[in-house]
């Protein structure tokens, strides 16, 4: 299996779109997650991340420039008990609400499809981290159109039990830049998680995202034993 460094992987593309990273810290004591957004249009770049308790939402940086809040204003992060949900759209709420009714992550996402932003039909990417019995597991999902055909939805879920320390999985919306934008292909990528503080990891990710296209970054460390969290947010718009 190919294991990439965060720097090499992020530098491999100028435009990942939106990306989710989930893994276990090198010391095995923390669950680690990151979510970033990139943008090419004025509307997409006109955003910031705002923390609301344990949750996080997107917000227009300049309300006067907001053209269409559809698909770009949502909660990327919500916490339900011992579960942390991270997604690139309002499916965060779908997962939260249906898991709260005892449905599974995969069942909740059966009610959703890719985004309706023709011709890209941006994939919906999602992740959930669960702490239990002194350990952690997580799952990732991507919902995407079949070769750009909006009548067909392909659904992939990847589950990771007792993940290896010092490793993370990375999934993002686009395979490369283009018009239309080609959807992510294959399994989530495997990244090396260095033995660093949350501030150092945040800086590592932010520094290696494309300078022109990066918009915002969220990083969280979750203590597997206690559930205590450390969170960092970086916004290009200030």
Residue ranges and their predicted role:
Residues 1-238:
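Conserved short alpha-helical segments that host acidic/polar catalytic motifs at enzyme active sites
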């Amino acid at each position: 299996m190919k294991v990439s460094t965060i720097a090499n992987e992020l530098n491999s593309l100028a435009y990942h779109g939106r990306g989710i990273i989930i893994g276990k810290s090198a010391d095995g004591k923390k669950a680690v997650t990151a979510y970033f957004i990139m943008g090419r249009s004025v509307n997409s770049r006109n955003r910031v991340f705002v923390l609301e308790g344990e949750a996080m939402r997107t917000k227009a940086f300049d309300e006067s420039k907001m053209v269409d809040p559809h698909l770009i204003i949502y909660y990327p992060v919500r916490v339900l008990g011992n579960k942390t949900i991270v997604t690139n759209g309002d499916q965060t709420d779908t997962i939260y609400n249906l898991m709260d009714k005892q449905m599974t992550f995969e069942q909740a996402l059966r009610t959703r499809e890719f985004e309706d932003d023709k011709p890209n039909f941006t994939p919906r990417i999602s992740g959930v981290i669960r702490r239990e019995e002194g350990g952690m597991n997580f799952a990732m999902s991507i919902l995407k159109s079949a070769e750009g055909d909006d009548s067909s939805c392909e659904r992939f879920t990847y589950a990771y039990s007792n993940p290896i320390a010092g490793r993370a999985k990375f999934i993002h919306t686009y395979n490369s830049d283009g018009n239309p934008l080609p959807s992510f292909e294959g399994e989530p990528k495997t990244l090396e998680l260095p033995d660093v503080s949350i501030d150092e990891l945040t800086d590592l990710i932010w520094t290696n995202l494309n300078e022109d296209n990066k918009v915002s970054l969220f990083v969280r460390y979750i203590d597997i034993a206690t559930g205590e969290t450390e969170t960092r947010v970086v916004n290009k718009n200030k």
